[in-house]
From Swiss-Prot:
Keywords: Cytoplasm, Initiation factor, Protein biosynthesis, Repeat, RNA-binding, WD repeat. It holds the Pfam family eIF2A. HAMAP family: eIF3b. This is Eukaryotic translation initiation factor 3 subunit B.
Amino acid sequence: MAPSFDTLSEQDLHEEEEEEIDFSDLKAQYEVKLDEGLDTFVVIDGLPIVPEESRQKLIKFLLRKLSAAGKTSEDAVFMPLNEKNMSEGFAFVEYETPEQAVAAVKQLHGTPLDKKHTLAVNKLMDIDRYGREGRIDEEYKPPTIEPFKEKEHLRSWLADPNARDQFALYRGDKVGVFWNNKNNPPENVVDRAHWTQLFVQWSPKGTYLASVHPQGIQLWGGPAFSKLKQFPHPFVSLVEFSPAENYVTTWSARPIQVEEGGSGPLSYEEDGKNIIIWDIVTGKPLRSFVSHDLAAGPAEAEAQPKKKVQWPAFKWSADEKYVARMLQGQSISIYEAPRMNLLGKTSVKIDGVMDFEWSPATVNRDGVKQYEQLLCFWTPEIGSNPARVGMMSVPSKEIVRTRNLFNVSDVKLHWQSQGTYVCVKVDRHSKSKKSMATNLEIFRVREKGVPVEVVDSLKDTVINFAWEPNGGRFVLITTGETPTGAAVPPKTAVSFFAPEKKGGSAGNFKLVRTIEKKTSNAIYWSPKGRFVVVATVHSQSSFDLDFWDMDFEGEKPEGEKDLAANLQLMKTVEHYGVTDVDWDPTGRYVVSSASVWTHSMENGWNLHTFAGQTLSENPTDKFKQFIWRPRPPTLLSKEEQKQVRKNLREYSKEFDEEDKYAVDIANTAVVEKRKRVLSEWLAWIRREKELLAEDKDAYGLPENVDDAKMAKDAPQVSEDQGETVVEEIVEEIIEENEEVIG
C-alpha cells in the first residue's frame, strides 16, 4: 500500500512517533485476491440505436475497435434489446484478462465511432461500485458552496521596503526561510522541523516552495508559508517546475500502484506510471508516463546496460505551450499543453538522437514572421553517416538548420539565455582515438540563415562552459588528459571569450585571456551578467573562488581594446570543502556552501559580496542545502529600465543615506542597551546602599562608620548557622570596535 498524505499530521511539522514495524503494505501488495468475475467486463455507451436485424452488423463493426485493446469475440459482446426489439445504445464486452479491460478503457474512452457517435467506455466494476442503489440520489441537491476565503498574497516578499531577498536553509531536520540582512544576522521568517524528508525546491519565479515526502510533494507560499497544494506521488524523488510555474513534473523509480476504490486525484490512468505532469492551479494530473530510463530487469541485465535517470525527463518550451521528451536513439515526442495531446499525432523520428534542448526564450529569426519555438538536437555518427546537429521549428517540425560533424565522441548543447546563440560543444577524437580536443560550433540564431561560427583554437578538452546571462560573452574551462592511475587531477585553464566590437552588431568571438595552472572546475555567472565566479568545488585539496569583473572600469590592456570586455580579477577567497556556489537573484551577493550531502567536514555557508568581500561565515551543524528565493522578471519596460540606469547615481545617494541611517539605528540600539544596563547597575547600587543604611540604623551605628573596617572586625559566622554570602559580578562594556583588514 503506497503512502498517503492522510498519514501526515495536520501541520506536517511534528516528529513521527516511533511505532512497531508495520507489514500491512507488504500484506496488501502480495495478498491473494479472489477472482470476482467482473474485472474482465467493460460497458460501452454512446452506440447507435439499431433494430435487431442490424445488431450483429454493428457488433462486427464495433469489434474492429475493441480488438485493438485486447482479445474478444462476437460471443463476448452482449447488446441488450428493449421491448420494441431496438438496441439500448450500450453493450457489455468481455475481454480475456482484467488488464485488457483496463487497456480498453484507456484507449477507447472518448474515441469517435463515426461522425455522430463517440464511445464512452467504463469498467463494469466501476458502474456497479458507483451506480449501486443508494449511491445516486434521485433528486438533485445543489452542492454546498464553501464561504469565500481570501488567499494569501503569494508575492508579498517582493514588497519588502528594503528590497531584501529571502533564502531557504535546510540543516539537520529543520528548514527555515530567512531575510538576507547583509552584515547583520539573517532575520527569520519561518523555521519548521520535519518540513521535508528529502530536499526543498523553489519554483522558477519564487512563488512556491516545494517540500518532498514519501507521500508526494507539497507546495507552500504566502507571508506565513501556508500549505497551498498537495500532489500525491508515492516515493517521489525528483521534481521539476515549468518556466511560468503553471505545471510541475514528479518522478519516482517505483511505478505507481493505484488501489481499487482509492480516493484522491490518482486514478487507474496513473497505475504503473513513473512520471506525472500536474496542473498546479487545479492540483490534478494532466498526464502520466512510464519512465524510459529505468534499469533493465534481471532477465535483460546482461543484454542491456543499466541507464542513468535522464532528468528532466520532460523539457518545456519557453512559453509552456509545448513539452517534449526523448526516447534516446529513436525519437522526440512533443506534446501540446494543457491537453497533452501528441503534436501532429506522431513523434518526430530522429535516428540515433542523443539529446535536445529548447531555446530558453521565444526567438524572432530574421525573415520569419510566423510564431515558432526552437529546439536543438544532435545525433552521433552511425555507420558512414556523420554526426549531426539540427535545429527544429515547432509547431511545423521543420528542420531549419543542420550541421555535420566528424570524429565526434560527445556533444553538449548550450543555449544563451535570450536564445540569440546556441553553442554546440563538440568533443572530437583523433583518427587514432588516442587524444581528445574540443571545438565550439556557435549558431547565430537571430541572423538570416543561422550562420555558424567555429572556435577551433582550443587544444584541450572543455570540461565546463557557461554563457553570460543576457549577454554575448562566455567562459570555459579546459584540462589536459588525465594519466592513467594519477592520484592528482591535472591542472585546468580558464578562458574568457568576448565578441569583437563591430558597429551595432556583435562580431566574431575572440579570446580575451587564458588563466593557466588553475584547479577550477565550475563557472557561476551573476544572473545580471558582468560578474562571474570561477571556483573549485567538490575537491579535497583546493577550495578557491575567483571573483572576476568582465567590465572593469580601469585601464584596458592594449591588446584587448577591440573586444567587448575589460577583464579584472577582483578577489580570491577560500572556503574549505566548498560544494556549491549560489548567486542571489539581484546579483549583489554570493553564497558558498559545504553540504553534509557531500562530506561531513566543516559544513556551513559563507556570504560574500559580488566583489568577493566576505560578509559572514556561518558554520552550521548538519548543513544540507542553501537556495536563494528567485524573483519574477521585472515589470519595467526597456525604456523604463534605461531611465533607471541613467539616474543610478542619484538613486545610489539615496541608498547610501539609507544604509548610513540603518547603521546609525544599529549604533543607537547598542548605546540604548548600554544605558539600560548602566541604569540597572546604578539602581542596584542605590538599593543596596539603602538596605545598608537601614541595617546601620537598626544596630545603632553612625552613618559615617568605616564599612570595610567594620566588616573586618566582625566575628566570623559558622557554616552551621545557615547564612551564606551572595556575590554578584557585573561587567560593563565601555567601547567596542570592529576593524576589517582588506
